[in-house]
């Protein structure tokens, strides 16, 4: 099969009446998903979309996202899912950087859409979905009798670009990683094997589908395997639990922030999720304490995976039924090579800290419109992740920090994640971000930005003393500042660049 579209067609022919996707009180069979995406693809071609054009999608986790996703691919377009909770200027930047030719959006995002549209330097075609019964709308708006064969099928090759996945921009402006249909097919196969996906599985999509991890591990893997996708439009942990149990969800892909919310809810009100057979945690590293507590409470095994937007978020992972080590992201999947190098590109020995490199067919084609950046991160087929980590004597990999986040203090390299892990052991601390800040002595000092648990008080001295009881002196924060909230990404990741920017303005 050359693309995910081939899998969609096979599953439509094999199980036309099987539920492909459901969201609250709406559902689509594989036959309906195929037909409706055909109709929308026809519309996109009629308004001028040509093969290779970039099409932006602006939706929450609703059925229209899934239809639009496959419609764009059928029309020969390149999918660009927009983070709709981003700042308008950030959205504008991404749309212009990728040279978007068309925007398909939810009608309830009309104000956001129009605010973005008026700022763009170039003209784009637009299609709005929503506001009516889905079947009536697609049957009426996008069909005029028989579909025109001229628009119905575009030849898709495996090396054609399928999607552009933008990085979070933690090191500067976001960059669009281009991936081929071949990349997505490979990774869908990888997930099928890793978690033994069958057509009987039901995936929960509570992570926003506009995030690359969700598109890859949830949407594409689900449709590839002919399973059912259960969409959750908004994160409300009580509703999440209800949706899981009402729909007998079997596979749950999440991030550590959601695991914490589930555990906090359990402490308030005991509940079970008996249908869930496996939880996959990705994007951000998860503490050993959370993993162990989750598995103990819910009797659901967790596997942790590691990757980046440039590698389709899978390079290594832990495995069910095999040894797992604390704080490790497991070992490389068989389709991928990983190694650790120093600043001179020399391969390091086990247990030595350096930059993580990844090589495999899951690697991106390159950054859109940024060939110089592509050359910078690719050397001899290896992708330089910018992540600092190590490999132990058993082949397990550990991700310690981002290269640019390492704090240089008095000749020592201090990894913020180590300090953060210690501070999260403090029962008063709810969340923490450790950053390097300039000091009067012209060296970097360590600052802990702390959010305390509700109705809890503490002092700078108390937090510093806690660190001194568990860490070498040079790793202890010199400064502590308390916050009610800190900027986060859509997946709950603390955005340290924005935290530093905020502090610089004070």
Give the label of every model feature segment:
Residues 249-254, 263-324, 337:
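Gly/Ser/Thr-rich phosphate-binding loop
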Residues 17, 128, 145-166, 173, ...:
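Conserved pre-ATP/AMP-binding loop-to-beta segment of ANL
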Residues 46-47, 74-140, 454-456:
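Structural core segment of the AMP-binding/adenylate-forming
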Residues 4, 17-62, 66-70, 87-92, ...:
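Conserved AMP-binding/adenylate-forming core of the ANL superfamily
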Residues 331-335, 346-377, 414:
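Conserved ATP/PPi-binding loop(s) of AMP-dependent carboxylate-activating enzymes
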Residues 29-31, 162-186:
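Conserved AMP-binding A3 loop
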């Amino acid at each position: 099969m050359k693309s995910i579209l081939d899998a969609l067609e096979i599953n439509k022919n094999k199980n036309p009446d099987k539920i492909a996707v459901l969201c609250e009180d709406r559902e689509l069979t594989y036959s309906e998903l195929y037909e409706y995406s055909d109709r929308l693809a026809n519309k996109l071609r009629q308004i001028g979309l040509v093969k290779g054009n970039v099409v932006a999608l602006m939706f929450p986790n609703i059925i229209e996202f899934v239809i639009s996703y496959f419609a764009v691919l059928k029309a020969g377009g390149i999918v660009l899912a927009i983070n709709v909770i981003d700042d308008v200027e950030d959205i504008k930047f991404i749309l212009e950087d990728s040279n978007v030719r068309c925007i398909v959006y939810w009608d309830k995002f009309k104000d956001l859409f129009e605010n973005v549209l008026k700022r763009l330097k170039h003209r784009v075609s637009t299609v709005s979905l929503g506001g009516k019964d889905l079947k009536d709308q697609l049957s009426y708006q996008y069909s005029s009798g028989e579909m025109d064969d001229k628009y119905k099928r575009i030849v898709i090759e495996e090396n054609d670009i399928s999607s552009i996945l933008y990085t979070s921009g933690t090191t500067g402006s976001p960059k669009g990683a281009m991936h081929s249909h071949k990349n997505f097919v490979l990774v869908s196969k990888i997930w099928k094997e890793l978690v033994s996906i069958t057509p009987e599985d039901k995936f929960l999509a509570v992570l926003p589908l506009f995030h690359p991890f969700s598109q890859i591990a949830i949407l594409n893997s689900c449709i590839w395997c002919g399973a059912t996708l259960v969409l959750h439009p908004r994160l409300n942990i009580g509703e999440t639990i209800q949706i899981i149990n009402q729909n007998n969800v079997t596979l749950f892909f999440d991030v550590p922030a959601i695991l914490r919310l589930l555990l906090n809810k359990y402490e308030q009100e005991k509940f079970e999720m008996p249908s869930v057979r496996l939880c996959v945690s990705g994007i951000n590293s998860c503490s050993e304490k959370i993993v162990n507590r989750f598995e103990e409470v819910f009797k659901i095994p967790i596997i942790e995976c590691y990757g980046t937007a440039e590698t389709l978020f899978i390079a290594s992972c832990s495995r069910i039924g095999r040894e797992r080590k604390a704080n490790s992201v497991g070992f490389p999947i068989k389709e991928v090579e990983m190694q650790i190098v120093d600043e001179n590109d020399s391969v390091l020995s086990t247990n030595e800290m350096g930059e993580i490199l990844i090589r495999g067919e899951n690697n991106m084609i390159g950054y859109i419109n940024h060939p110089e950046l592509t050359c910078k991160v690719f050397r001899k087929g290896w992708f330089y992740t910018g992540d600092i980590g190590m490999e132990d004597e058993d082949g397990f990999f550990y991700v310690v920090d981002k290269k640019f986040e390492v704090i240089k203090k008095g000749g020592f390299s201090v990894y913020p994640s180590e300090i953060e892990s210690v501070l999260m052991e403090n029962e008063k601390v709810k969340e923490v971000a450790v950053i390097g800040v300039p000091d009067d002595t012209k060296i970097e000092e360590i600052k802990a930005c702390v959010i305390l648990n509700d109705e809890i008080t503490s002092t700078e001295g108390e937090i510093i003393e806690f660190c001194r009881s568990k860490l070498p002196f040079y790793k202890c924060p010199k400064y502590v500042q308390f916050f009610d909230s800190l900027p986060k990404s859509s997946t709950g990741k603390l955005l340290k660049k924005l935290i530093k920017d905020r502090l610089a303005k004070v």
